[in-house]
């Protein structure tokens, strides 16, 4: 009997992306997998259809839109009470956590598992992630310090090649297997014992920064976050953020503030936190206004094109 690898995906009306996720999964590993859909209240019927189509898919409704990290935590916590689809045991100590808009590259999961055997202190391993246009997304980064992270957050949208953003995103480094500060939570191979040791994802983060926070806490507990570019996936990430960019931007800034404020606590640092909060609020206002202007221009061009 072969051990089964659990794959946890959080769904919220994922649309056609889920089919690509599941169809490509068979190419990613020769090992049997069981997909656990932590559903945060989908209304498009896609997760239910996937359960009917794929015998190795199970639907685990969370009861509400709990956010990414909370849904993952609850699902991983249930693994001890479940087994594979035919009663097989789980792969010892490993679980895949991924967004449902990931499309798996051939052999990508096997490459992550192979790397795990080379890094006995790896708490999380992440693949090379490509955007839909084929470019490499900077998914393996340094831990954001107050200066580096703050300057990236404030200046990045308006000056993408500023030195703080460039250092933080590590875009000038050639892809190589190495420990990094943190890995994108859109696709991770996670050591369950390490994940449990640090308490899983911090559930204060509804979305964004929960992966940065996890990488930080894993590192402080003596675990490594390892980038494995021999494993490749494609991430169709615009499907969720495109629905309501203003609210997603606000959520990102809230999570950024939580992360940095946690690491700069104390009454004597209150002015620093006030400055950070104000800077993030200003950034949010400017970016939302810019987004609305672009949207109005696009609509105007469409109207003009009809005449």
Swiss-Prot record:
<comment type="similarity">
    <text>Belongs to the glycosyltransferase 2 family.</text>
</comment>
<keyword id="KW-0808">Transferase</keyword>
<comment type="function">
    <text>Involved in the biosynthesis of the mycolylarabinogalactan-peptidoglycan (mAGP) complex, an essential component of the mycobacterial cell wall. Catalyzes the transfer of the rhamnosyl moiety from dTDP-rhamnosyl (dTDP-Rha) onto the decaprenyl-pyrophosphoryl-GlcNAc (C50-PP-GlcNAc), yielding rhamnosyl-decaprenyl-pyrophosphoryl-GlcNAc (Rha-C50-PP-GlcNAc).</text>
</comment>
<dbReference type="Pfam" id="PF00535">
    <property type="entry name" value="Glycos_transf_2"/>
</dbReference>
<dbReference type="GO" id="GO:0005886">
    <property type="term" value="C:plasma membrane"/>
</dbReference>
<dbReference type="InterPro" id="IPR029044">
    <property type="entry name" value="Nucleotide-diphossugar_trans"/>
</dbReference>
<keyword id="KW-0328">Glycosyltransferase</keyword>
<dbReference type="GO" id="GO:0102096">
    <property type="term" value="F:decaprenyl-N-acetyl-alpha-D-glucosaminyl-pyrophosphate:dTDP-alpha-L-rhamnose rhamnosyltransferase activity"/>
</dbReference>
<protein>
    <recommendedName>
        <fullName>N-acetylglucosaminyl-diphospho-decaprenol L-rhamnosyltransferase</fullName>
        <ecNumber>2.4.1.289</ecNumber>
    </recommendedName>
</protein>
<dbReference type="GO" id="GO:0016758">
    <property type="term" value="F:hexosyltransferase activity"/>
</dbReference>
<dbReference type="InterPro" id="IPR001173">
    <property type="entry name" value="Glyco_trans_2-like"/>
</dbReference>
<dbReference type="GO" id="GO:0000271">
    <property type="term" value="P:polysaccharide biosynthetic process"/>
</dbReference>
């Amino acid at each position: 009997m072969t051990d089964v690898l659990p794959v946890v995906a959080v769904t919220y009306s994922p649309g056609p992306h889920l089919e690509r996720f599941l169809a490509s999964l068979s190419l990613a590993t020769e090992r049997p997998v069981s997909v656990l859909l932590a559903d945060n209240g989908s209304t498009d019927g896609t997760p239910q259809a996937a359960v009917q189509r794929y015998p190795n898919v199970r639907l685990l409704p969370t009861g509400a839109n709990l956010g990414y990290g909370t849904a993952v935590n609850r699902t991983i916590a249930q693994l001890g009470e479940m087994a594979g689809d035919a009663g097989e045991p789980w792969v010892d100590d490993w679980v895949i956590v991924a967004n449902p808009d990931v499309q798996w590259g051939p052999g990508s999961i096997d490459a992550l598992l192979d790397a795990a055997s080379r890094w006995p202190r790896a708490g999380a391993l992440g693949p090379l992630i490509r955007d839909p246009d084929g470019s490499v997304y900077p998914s393996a980064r340094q831990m954001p310090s107050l200066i580096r992270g703050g300057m990236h957050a404030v200046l990045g949208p308006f000056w993408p090649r500023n030195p703080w953003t460039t250092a933080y995103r590590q875009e000038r480094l050639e892809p190589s297997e190495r420990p990094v500060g943190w890995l994108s939570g859109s696709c991770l191979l996670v050591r369950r014992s390490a994940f449990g040791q640090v308490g899983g994802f911090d559930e204060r983060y509804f979305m964004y920064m929960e992966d940065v926070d996890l990488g930080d806490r894993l590192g402080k507990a003596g675990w490594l976050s390892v980038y494995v570019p021999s494993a490749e996936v494609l991430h169709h990430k615009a499907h969720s953020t495109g629905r309501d960019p203003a609210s997603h931007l606000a959520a990102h800034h809230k999570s950024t503030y939580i992360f940095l404020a946690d690491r700069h606590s104390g009454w004597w640092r209150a002015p620093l936190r006030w400055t950070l909060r104000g800077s993030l609020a200003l950034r949010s206002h400017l970016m939302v206004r810019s987004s609305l202007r672009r949207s109005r221009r696009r609509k105007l061009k469409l109207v003009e094109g009809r005449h």
